């Protein structure tokens, strides 16, 4: 760490001195500090304190002497511990040295040996402040100059007693030695052993924060946000409540010299804070109060944490800095206690400031007291900002309290994940986090300032207020901001992609936020107003002026920042639930404005929101609880910080367990989460709290930041690695995944659901809608997405039921898979509910809220996947938002997680979607039973089986068979039982709504049976299912939108296009795309799961399932589309759906072709997004289209046909998808089933409006498949219903068949109109070889494909005309045959022939009403089979 220290030193021309003095520990601190300082400087913060921290002990003492003199003066006046305090200050210097350089710890303190262990923490804390705050030995550097300015300012105030301070500093240690010896040692050993080192680090941070705070209130705003956040909030909330906080926060270190500690802590913190922030006169009263506090603190020393909180609360009234101490002490001592006490306080106050709330609990006077104190304290340094200080004082009080509460949580959150907050470490995990604390803490500094800088700018009003207000406020602001931001930042750092994506999404979300759902915005505003009103009394309007409660997004941001950076983030993130824009801004705000939101506010508010939801059952309550949550958030955060504080923490039913679980869950999570996953993600996640409740946590959440913070974790459950996604963490999720994450997820999910349910009661219906949209955007914030689903489900007990089901299943799965499952389940089932509910609510399709984490939280994880994936997500989003916000939302969310995460994640999603939806409908019990049954299979089997369980025929044939019995409608013979039963069971067992899902599921299930040895039965089942479920699907289309807890989610994905063909035209695209993804994820995942369990032997368990998954996805699309009308329309729709990526643009329109494919097909390109497509979504759609267009432009024929292709790619893409997905699924199944297979779809979907990327890969066979009647590149499919011809431009099939070579990125044009044999043969190898990057060995397949393609094309010509039914049947057949062929023939030729033969047999049974289907099916199957075989045989 010397390097970093040297950096600081060099920068300050103090390297030699520092280098010589600092030991490893000091260097470590210095290095971290230096980095943090640089970051802070970058973030427009003069945080040279970090560098100063590196200052040698002597300098530390010097600075401390001067610095401490003032502080000690305060403390002495206050607590009359002058002798103790100065000596303690010296000790602190020693401590700073100790922390910075352990040797100095001994060498730098004469009395150190005396009170070395006990006072060390205190010393460190105080000393670090001196060292960090006031290292005067670095005057050369600009930082040094700034520090000098601070010193001068401070000196001007403390020069009167600089000497006195210093000598007392020396005197104090002896006094402190006994005190610390007794109390600190006890507390230190019991809970602060780790704090001992951490406090020094935090102390340094705090002092650094405070010194700039003194010098530059604004600088402190940025620097202190992290520094103060770390120091003040971590263990140096004592900066605000030096004595109280130090005592409370570091009850052991500071409680030891309780008598002198208040002074000392006060002196140290006040030194850096009050000296710079407040006048000495103001400090004297404070010192007296602190003295009292110190007196109280010693008593609380033994309880350390509890006493800490109590003392802190008691001192807190005198100084709101106590709030941080209290909160953090509470956090440290007992999450429950904090939750009980601080939360109770918070709840009663209903303020955003946990500190204020705590004060209210401890004493209503504290609120005014801190104001008074702060006002007096602020004048000298903050007098120029006194105008604001009146507000800021209150706000600082609020801020400090909020930050204290949130700081503790943020610190907690951070300290666990980043372990940057010593206090948090000391308090919550005093022993464990301390070690980690140093790096995370400094990293937070590094990261926080940048985002806080944004955030500060964002909440310039409030942030300056924060800076301006008294040091406690500043410290709190910074501290709170820092925990959150640092966490977030760490998360973001961990998930750089998340940050990038988040920035993009932030813009989108801001767009969505402001243009998306006025109602929700209004609601959010109202909620904010209420919260602000509640906080207002505490902050005396600081929030109002700074955070303008009236302005929901911006002012909330500012308001909360006014409260404290974290608070500012909290409001935006809290309110985003109410305001999609805010969630969107929130998720991304979390990422952009600050991980603070994701971290501290997220969690604090998330937890608070959750509790508020439980208690208030309304957004306002939740927002209200924001502060309360902050107050007790530390508890939740305590457990969750490592997981996905940001995203998950938001919804924490149980403070620690639930919060932790949630944190893990979503961030994992939001997402960003996560979610910024997005990391957070943990993706992760009331606006924000509600969002978090709605699972904006990050997911992934993040929150996104959570990922980093916690894993640096992953945002929240899903977003954390970007926000908790498999890439989320379950994809790059924040969790130290595995057991903890799962538990957290479970907690979080359940709590979130409950929260959301209650939130709904609070009129969050709109919010839900908004959050649905939001979530869409913040899929990265899987938590958000989950939260959204949960919000919608909160009114549905089923949501919890599903979630539990999901959790049950997820628990069985592997840790990562579990995470993914939970996320997936969350998202899936929540999404199912959300989808339905969103449709019911018909929320404005603001895609502000989807990110995560996936972690599923935002798109971060997926974005992390290929760029195409993000594009796809926008397409999905757009479509989803347009036609069925929920549907698209869910679809896109689920697919993303699958893409981002493993099949496990995907499976859980589907699982939950299917299972949740099913239980919602009629099969809750059965689904549960199935899920449990499936749960028997651990890992993928369990996950997939569980999904299958959702689908009645999950477990291979057995569940299907029983399900067949269960579903009266199951007319498929037992041989088709697996798939048929799944379909029928779902169709028959559940109503049409359920049927829709079952279709998907059957699609999934069918592949298993079909793949293995039931292709014929499966096909008949498919045919039948197409008919019955087709009807049901249609039927369900309407209900799907209506009923909130429907199985529709999967069916919605599959049916979204079908049922919502008019209104869901766009949904069709998203549905297609989502179905595609969802099929891929939900049906595919389930399919995959069933296949995996069932076909473990037939296929390579994973490959077949994987291929089947895609295939099934296509099949599901086919079934739903084809069976909906059981017409070409359905087939067309299936096609539309099938080309999820390829059809995304086209599918947007075809999306609605489930009922009227023609219409959407017409709209496909231009009106691909039907009704309400938020500009953001539109943008995403456009972007996807652009990508597709580029490819098409490369091969202009493709581009032209892109338009006609819009209609065409759907059917064609279905074929492609069926075949293509099968191949990718099949093969990737073996390799990395979900990820691999998903990325192609992602490419397909996101890249295009036509499955060009997909086409590229599987395009060879696919394009060959379309080759039949029309040019290989174009497949003209007629919608029998509308009679409209859709030219599906298959990326690899244009009139001049243009094959896209993914490897070279070039388009190979081969004229393959009718001469499929001649033209297609040569190109297919090229196309296959080139376009099929994934399947380079496709060349043989192309030949095979060409052979079938000829048949296909021959059959296809008629098929196009009678494509509707035929294509539908063909697709189903193709799926069946495809699977059958895959199972039957691994060889390309075998594939072609068997598919042709098998397809026909399957075709007729599959679609009894579709006689002509055989031809199209043959073509499709040929491609599919070829691809599959190519994948299977060639690979």
UniProtKB/Swiss-Prot annotation:
Pfam families the record matches: DUF4585 (PF15232)
- Name positions with the PTM Phosphoserine: 323, 470, 816
Q: Where is the composition biased (Acidic residues)?
A: 1424-1435
Q: Which residues carry this modification: Phosphothreonine?
A: 120
Instruction: Output compositional bias ranges, type Polar residues.
Output: 133-147, 668-679, 831-847, 1067-1082, 1094-1105
Predominant location? cytoplasm
Which residues, by range, are in coiled-coil regions?
A: none
User: Which domain of life does the protein's organism represent?
Assistant: Eukaryota
Q: Where in the cell? A: Cytoplasm, Myofibril, Sarcomere, Z line
Task: Tell me the keywords, alphabetical order.
Answer: Cytoplasm, Phosphoprotein
Annotated segments matching region Disordered = 109-176, 203-234, 250-270, 291-311, 362-592, 609-772, 795-847, 1007-1108, 1138-1261, 1363-1435
Hey, what tissues is this thing expressed in?
Answer: Expressed in the heart and skeletal muscle.
| Biased composition range(s): Low complexity | 727-741, 1055-1066, 1083-1093
Regions of biased composition (Basic and acidic residues) lie at: 149-160, 389-402, 479-493, 522-535, 609-620, 650-667, 751-772, 1194-1211
Composition bias, Basic residues: 1182-1193
Could you tell me the Gene Ontology terms of the biological process aspect for this record?
cardiac muscle cell contraction; cardiac muscle cell differentiation; heart morphogenesis; positive regulation of calcineurin-NFAT signaling cascade
What InterPro entries does this protein map onto?
A: CEFIP (IPR052303), DUF4585 (IPR027838)
Cited function: Plays an important role in cardiomyocyte hypertrophy via activation of the calcineurin/NFAT signaling pathway.
Q: Which PANTHER family does this one have?
A: CARDIAC-ENRICHED FHL2-INTERACTING PROTEIN, CARDIAC-ENRICHED FHL2-INTERACTING PROTEIN-RELATED
- How is this protein named in the record? Cardiac-enriched FHL2-interacting protein
Gene responsible for this protein: CEFIP
């Amino acid at each position: 760490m010397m390097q970093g220290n040297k950096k600081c030193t060099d920068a300050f021309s103090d390297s030699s001195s520092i280098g010589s003095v600092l030991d490893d520990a000091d260097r470590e601190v210095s290095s971290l500090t230096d980095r943090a300082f640089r970051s802070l400087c970058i973030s427009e913060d003069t945080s040279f304190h970090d560098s100063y921290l590196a200052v040698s002990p002597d300098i530390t003492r010097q600075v401390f002497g001067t610095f401490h003199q003032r502080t000690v003066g305060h403390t002495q006046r206050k607590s009359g511990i002058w002798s103790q305090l100065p000596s303690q200050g010296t000790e602190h210097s020693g401590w700073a040295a100790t922390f910075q350089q352990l040797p100095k710890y001994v060498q730098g303190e004469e009395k150190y040996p005396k009170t070395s262990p006990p006072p060390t923490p205190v010393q460190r804390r105080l000393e670090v402040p001196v060292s960090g705050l006031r290292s005067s030995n670095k005057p050369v550097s600009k930082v040094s100059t700034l520090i000098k300015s601070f010193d001068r300012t401070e000196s001007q105030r403390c020069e009167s007693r600089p000497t006195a301070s210093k000598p007392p500093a020396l005197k104090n240690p002896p006094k402190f030695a006994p005190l610390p010896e007794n109390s600190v040692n006890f507390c230190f050993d019991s809970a602060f052993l780790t704090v001992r080192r951490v406090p020094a680090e935090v102390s340094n941070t705090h002092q650094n924060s405070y010194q700039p705070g003194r010098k530059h209130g604004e600088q402190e705003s940025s620097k202190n946000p992290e520094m103060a956040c770390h120091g003040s909030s971590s263990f140096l909330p004592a900066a605000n409540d030096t004595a109280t906080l130090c005592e409370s926060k570091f009850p052991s270190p500071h409680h030891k010299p309780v008598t002198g500690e208040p002074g000392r802590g006060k002196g140290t913190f006040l030194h850096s804070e009050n000296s710079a922030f407040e006048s000495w006169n103001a400090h004297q009263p404070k010192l007296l109060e602190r003295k009292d506090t110190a007196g109280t603190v010693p008593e609380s020393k033994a309880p350390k944490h509890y006493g800490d909180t109590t003392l802190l609360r008691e001192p807190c009234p005198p100084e709101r800095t106590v709030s941080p101490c209290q909160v953090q002490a509470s956090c440290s001592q007992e999450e429950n206690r904090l939750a009980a006490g601080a939360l109770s306080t918070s709840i009663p106050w209903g303020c955003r400031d946990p500190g204020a709330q705590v004060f209210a609990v401890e004493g209503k006077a504290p609120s005014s007291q801190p104001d008074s104190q702060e006002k007096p304290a602020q004048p000298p340094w903050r007098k120029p900002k006194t105008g604001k200080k009146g507000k800021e004082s209150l706000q600082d009080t609020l801020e400090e309290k909020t930050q204290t509460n949130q700081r503790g949580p943020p610190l907690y959150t951070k300290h666990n994940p980043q372990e940057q907050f010593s206090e948090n470490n000391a308090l919550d995990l005093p022993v464990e986090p301390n070690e980690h604390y140093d790096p995370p803490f400094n990293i937070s500094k590094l990261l926080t300032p940048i985002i806080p800088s944004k955030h500060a700018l964002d909440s310039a009003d409030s942030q300056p207020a924060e800076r301006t207000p008294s040091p406690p406020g500043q410290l709190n602001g910074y501290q709170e901001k820092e925990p959150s931001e640092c966490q977030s930042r760490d998360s973001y750092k961990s998930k750089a992609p998340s940050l990038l994506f988040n920035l993009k999404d932030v813009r989108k979300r801001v767009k969505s936020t402001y243009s998306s759902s006025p109602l929700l915005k209004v609601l959010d505003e109202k909620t904010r107003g209420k919260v602000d009103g509640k906080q207002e009394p505490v902050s005396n309007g600081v929030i109002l002026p700074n955070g303008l409660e009236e302005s929901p997004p911006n002012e909330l941001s500012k308001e909360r920042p006014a409260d404290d950076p974290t608070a500012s983030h909290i409001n935006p993130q809290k309110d985003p639930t109410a305001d999609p824009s805010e969630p969107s801004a929130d998720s991304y705000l979390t990422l952009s404005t600050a991980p603070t939101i994701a971290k501290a506010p997220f969690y604090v508010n998330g937890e608070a929101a959750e509790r508020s939801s439980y208690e208030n059952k309304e957004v306002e309550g939740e927002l209200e609880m924001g502060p309360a949550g902050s107050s007790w958030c530390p508890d939740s955060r305590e457990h969750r910080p490592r997981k996905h504080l940001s995203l998950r923490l938001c919804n924490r039913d149980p403070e620690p367990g639930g919060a932790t679980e949630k944190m893990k869950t979503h961030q994992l999570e939001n997402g960003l989460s996560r979610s910024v996953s997005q990391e957070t993600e943990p993706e992760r996640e009331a606006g924000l709290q509600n969002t978090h409740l709605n699972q904006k946590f990050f997911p992934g959440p993040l929150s996104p930041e959570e990922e980093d913070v916690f894993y640096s974790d992953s945002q929240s459950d899903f977003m954390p690695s970007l926000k908790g996604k498999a890439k989320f963490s379950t994809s790059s999720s924040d969790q130290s995944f595995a057991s903890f994450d799962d538990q957290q997820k479970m907690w979080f999910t359940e709590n979130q659901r409950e929260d959301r349910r209650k939130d709904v009661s609070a009129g969050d219906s709109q919010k839900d809608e908004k959050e649905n949209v939001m979530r869409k955007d913040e899929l990265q914030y899987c938590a958000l997405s989950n939260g959204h689903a949960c919000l919608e489900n909160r009114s549905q007990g089923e949501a919890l039921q599903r979630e539990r089901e999901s959790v049950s299943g997820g628990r069985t799965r592997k840790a990562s898979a579990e995470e993914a499952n939970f996320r997936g389940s969350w998202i899936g089932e929540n999404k199912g509910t959300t989808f339905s509910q969103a449709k019911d609510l018909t929320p404005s399709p603001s895609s502000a809220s989807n990110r995560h984490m996936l972690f599923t939280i935002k798109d971060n994880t997926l974005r992390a996947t290929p760029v195409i994936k993000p594009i796809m997500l926008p397409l999905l989003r757009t479509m989803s938002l347009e036609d069925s916000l929920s549907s698209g939302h869910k679809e896109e969310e689920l697919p993303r997680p699958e893409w981002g995460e493993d099949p496990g994640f995907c499976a859980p999603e589907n699982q939950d979607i299917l299972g949740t939806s099913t239980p919602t409908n009629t099969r809750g019990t059965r689904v549960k039973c199935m899920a449990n049954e499936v749960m028997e299979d651990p890992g993928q089997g369990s996950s997939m089986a569980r999904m299958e369980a959702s689908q009645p025929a999950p477990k291979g044939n057995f569940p299907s068979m029983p399900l067949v019995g269960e579903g009266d409608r199951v007319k498929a013979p037992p041989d088709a039982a697996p798939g048929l039963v799944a379909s029928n069971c779902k169709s028959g067992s559940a109503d049409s709504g359920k049927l829709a899902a079952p279709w998907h599921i059957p699609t999934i299930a069918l592949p298993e049976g079909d793949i293995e040895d039931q292709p014929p039965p499966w096909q008949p089942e498919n045919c039948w299912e197409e008919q019955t479920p087709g009807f049901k699907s249609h039927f369900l289309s309407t209900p799907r939108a209506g009923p909130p807890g429907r199985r529709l989610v999967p069916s919605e994905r599959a049916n979204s296009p079908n049922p919502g063909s008019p209104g869901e035209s766009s949904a069709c695209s998203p549905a297609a795309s989502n179905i595609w993804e969802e099929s891929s994820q939900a049906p595919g995942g389930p399919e995959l799961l069933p296949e995996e369990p069932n076909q473990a032997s037939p296929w390579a368990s994973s490959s077949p399932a994987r291929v089947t998954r895609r295939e099934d996805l296509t099949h599901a699309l086919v079934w739903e589309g084809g069976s909906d009308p059981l017409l070409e329309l359905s087939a067309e729709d299936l096609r539309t759906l099938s080309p999820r990526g390829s059809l995304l643009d086209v599918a947007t329109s075809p999306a609605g072709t489930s009922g009227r494919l023609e219409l959407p097909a017409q709209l496909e390109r231009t009106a691909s997004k039907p009704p309400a497509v938020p500009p953001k979504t539109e943008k995403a759609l456009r972007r996807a289209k652009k990508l597709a267009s580029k490819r098409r432009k490369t091969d202009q024929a493709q581009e032209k046909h892109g338009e006609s292709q819009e209609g065409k790619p759907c059917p064609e893409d279905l074929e492609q998808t069926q075949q293509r997905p099968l191949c990718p699924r099949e093969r990737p199944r073996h390799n990395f089933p979900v990820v691999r297979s998903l990325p192609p779809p992602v490419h397909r979907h996101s890249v295009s409006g036509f499955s060009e990327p997909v086409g590229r890969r599987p395009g060879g066979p696919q394009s060959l498949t379309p080759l039949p009647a029309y040019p290989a590149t174009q497949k003209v499919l007629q919608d029998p219903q509308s009679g409209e011809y859709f030219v599906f431009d298959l990326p690899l099939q244009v009139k001049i068949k243009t094959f896209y070579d993914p490897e070279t990125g070039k388009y190979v044009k081969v004229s393959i109109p009718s001469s499929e044999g001649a033209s297609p043969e040569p190109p297919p190898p090229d196309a296959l070889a080139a376009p099929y990057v994934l399947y380079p060995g496709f060349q043989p397949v192309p030949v095979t494909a060409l052979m079938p393609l000829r048949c296909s094309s021959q059959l296809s010509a008629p098929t196009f005309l009678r494509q509707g039914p035929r294509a539908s049947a063909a697709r189903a057949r193709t799926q069946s045959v495809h699977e059958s062929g895959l199972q039957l023939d691994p060889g390309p030729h075998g594939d072609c022939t068997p598919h042709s033969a098998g397809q026909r047999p399957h075709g007729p049974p599959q679609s009894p009403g579709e006689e002509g289907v055989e031809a199209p099916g043959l073509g499709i199957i040929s491609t599919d089979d070829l691809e599959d075989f190519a994948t299977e045989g060639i690979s």
